[in-house]
């Protein structure tokens, strides 16, 4: 076993506070010593600890008093989380800094305590680089599976707006304006995500069963759905029509902002943003069930044929 090897840190079982004894570091010599840093245990050599002019060198060259417990572990009353990284730096002057800005700050605080100026400089340079690097402020998840979608929505503390668009679901030709309207829906989604990215979680779904459909969620449940596609008839053939209900999309997006509050049951809020209750009397259980399962579905479907049927006629069609 090399004299410059530091074993992995382990955390001993909690127990009574160890009894400490005064101990002079000068009598340790160039051999392995055992360190207990905030409950994390390390093996290293005096040679590593005294290689640089730091507080550790003062401790283990006899200039400062060190304390040991009855089992011979030298006690250092600091957090041991980053002490392994500090030993690595003392050993060969190199270190792989953490990716997290917060952890780099933690490491720098420990380096300042031990008076390791070289490591402090490296941490400061890394933090400056992170300041100069612009991180994305608007990240849009793209759904890869229904299970992933469910987890995203359930775990989000924010309201959720989802846009599903998948042109491959179309069986027929598109009407003349459908491509433009599909693009307008996508562009509006991008604009809303930039405007409300700090308040609403926006997600995209490109594997769903619809061609273009908006869904709105609050406190983990679906509140509304705006389907922008329909089947129309022209010259005796079916066509798929994609529309752009801009006002309705804005309305539903503003409605989900009411759900920015913590996720607590609020029947009055759910009722205020749901469709009007039926006037018929129901039992309390029926009302609770209706409230939980109600979703506003706004299907923008208009049917027109080569005959005299008027645009906007709501008629069911079966293939």
Swiss-Prot record:
GO molecular function per UniProt: small GTPase binding
Pfam family, one: BTB_2
Domain of life, per lineage: Eukaryota
Record bears the keyword Cytoplasm: yes
SUPFAM superfamilies given in the database record: POZ domain (SSF54695)
Keywords: Cytoplasm, Endosome, Nucleus, Ubl conjugation pathway
Keyword Amino-acid biosynthesis assigned: no
A GO CC term assigned to this protein in UniProt: nucleus
Gene3D superfamilies: Potassium Channel Kv1.1, Chain A
Record domain BTB: where: 31-99
Biological processes, Gene Ontology terms: cell migration; immune response; negative regulation of Rho protein signal transduction; proteasome-mediated ubiquitin-dependent protein catabolic process; protein homooligomerization; protein ubiquitination; stress fiber assembly
SMART domains associated with the record: BTB (SM00225)
UniProt-annotated location(s): Cytoplasm; Nucleus; Endosome
Pathway assigned in UniProt: Protein modification; protein ubiquitination
Family to which this protein belongs: Belongs to the BACURD family.
Task of the protein: Substrate-specific adapter of a BCR (BTB-CUL3-RBX1) E3 ubiquitin-protein ligase complex involved in regulation of cytoskeleton structure. The BCR(TNFAIP1) E3 ubiquitin ligase complex mediates the ubiquitination of target proteins, leading to their degradation by the proteasome.
Subunit structure: Component of the BCR(TNFAIP1) E3 ubiquitin ligase complex, at least composed of cul3, tnfaip1/bacurd2 and rbx1.
Protein name: BTB/POZ domain-containing adapter for CUL3-mediated RhoA degradation protein 2
